[in-house]
Amino acid sequence: MTLPSDTAPGDDLAPDMRRFQRWLADAYAHHPPLDSVSLPEARLIAERVRAPLAQGGPAMVRTQDVQIPTAHGALGLRIHTPTAAPRHPALLYLHGGGWVFFSIATHDRVMRELAARAGRTVIGVDYARAPEARYPVAREQAVAAWRWAQAHAEEHGMDPDRIALGGDSAGANLALAAALVLRDAGERPDALLLNYGVYDDDDSTESYARFDGPAYNLGRDEMRGFWDRYLGQPRPPVDPLATPLKARLAGLPRCCLVVPECDVLRDDSLALAARLREAGVPVSLQRHPGAVHSFLEAISFSAAAESGLAQSSAWLRGDAAD
């Protein structure tokens, strides 16, 4: 049972998160509502609004955009190399956006921050988005990208035995699903970094009830729309690789879950952490009070984002206990 809250929407946010929410609201106010324009135009607006968040941050010794072949056509990757040291460990990173929005451009700052802080080459995946490319295209591209990274590690100064998978929101869903496919094929990423991910289509949880609405950056109706575009209508039979909270999780590598408390998806992460532990998977559960969905993108002005990136990067380096 969900008890009524005596806290007004947004009052439980940290001050820097309120600033983040105001900034986003002001930026979107200069454009038509996304649901009033075509999807291509909505994507352009979302890219323009998010573009300032991707600016600044650490410089890389090298950034390279490449195209690789996959069963679904050419796939773009962005490779951020933080230093000239040989044989970096690596992180294949899948951006969020409900499988529908955003890109490696909107998440460029987050990826460079992780590269610099964790000492890993970070490879962003420009996967095909829904509804033009529905499930399982993006997941299959994620698997293909990880296999390409392992096969071409030496030429890009990476350690082929230390290539992690990660992502945020819908990208965390894809990262976890890709790890399950690789596990079943006898392959293994060396770690999983999952930032405020969506792992199930059940929106009856307490966090959906408590944090639904614009004050918290993501809502129930928005997530339902994302699921419909990703899976199609009518919904196909349940596939645990689309909703990996329902999958068998044993045999996965160590996993870090970054969880903002004020997020409709919070309970997805808490349930996943419990199931991973039951399956014997080492889990680091990093909870961030007062933070909202997508909070890591606010790194240019947010103490919560600084803490989130610092903690998860320390975990990737092996400096933090599970």
Regions found by a protein language model. Name each.
Residues 180-235:
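Hydrolase active-site cap/lid region
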Residues 133-154:
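Alpha/beta-hydrolase active-site loop
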Residues 300-322:
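Catalytic active-site module of serine/aspartate enzymes centered on a nucleophile-bearing elbow/loop
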Residues 87-97:
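Short beta-strand element of the alpha/beta-hydrolase
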Residues 105-124:
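Short amphipathic alpha-helix adjacent to the substrate-entry channel of hydrolases
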Residues 1-79, 321-322:
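A glycine/proline-hinged amphipathic helix-loop "lid/cap" segment
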Residues 234-289:
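Serine-hydrolase catalytic core
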Residues 150-165:
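Gly/Ser-rich "nucleophile elbow"/oxyanion-hole loop immediately N-terminal to the catalytic nucleophile
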